[in-house]
Amino acid sequence: MPGPIVALTVDCTCALNGKCYVSGIVEATEQAIVPCTWLLGVSEHDPMSNVKLYHNEYLHRIPAWHEIGLYLSFDTGASNTVDRGDLIRVGKDILKQFSIKPTAFRAANGDLEAGDIKALEDIGILVDSTPGSSAELPKDAPRSPYHPSYTHPYQKGEAKLWIAPVAHVNGVRGYIDQGFDVLKAVIDAHLTLSDILVLGMTDCVDNRENLAHVIAYLKQKGARFTTLTQLVSEL
């Protein structure tokens, strides 16, 4: 029986948090020869800091076969879809200044609205991984990748982009920051629901040891590791 398909993702916001553990994540993934999707943070009140930091200090350390995507914070809680669409385009344009064309996306704090779906498609996003990345996830939300509705991002529909939700079980999200023991329970429970597993982590937490344990555990299960965009391209 084939093992699970796994996408590891990193929320890259360390410029705003004062601590950055990119090197440990790179080390763990290189030692295990697995790719990762790095989602570069752009925030409404400080759009450039994270991208500049990564460009100057870290992008040259991340293997070319990893993926670079966009992580966007709607800081003011703007509810007007036109304003949010403008922010999505700003995020794309900032990454474009550094020769990055993102096709993977995540909104901070699970803040994905229906009007965002079309705006994401318009800038070339192929896969969103917002659902499951925060504390809240509707119980009836799909656990495997799906095409969302244009009117409800947590329901299946006719949108062109995919949503690849982060593993989320009994109110616990699949983030490596929480430690291997917590994550092992999430992984085991999620794999009873889907053989596709998306896990998250943040770059402001020292995840090297936890990540190495998670990768080793999943390899024992015969897991195949991929990036978010490659994952949905195979569906």
Please give the residue ranges for each predicted region.
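C-terminal domain-boundary segment and adjacent tail
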Residues: P2, A32, T37, K184-L235
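Metal-dependent polysaccharide deacetylase catalytic core of the NodB/CE4 family, i.e.
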Residues: P35-G115, P131, A135-P138, A159-K160, ...
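Glycan-processing catalytic domains of CAZymes
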Residues: T9, G69-L70, I125-S129
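Generic structural signal for well-ordered alpha-helices
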Residues: V22-V26, H55-L59, G85-K92, I117, ...
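Short, well-ordered alpha-helical microsegments
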Residues: G18, E113-I117, N207-L211
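Active-site beta->alpha N-cap acidic-glycine motif
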Residues: M1-P63
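Active-site-adjacent pocket scaffolds in enzyme catalytic domains
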Residues: A107-S194
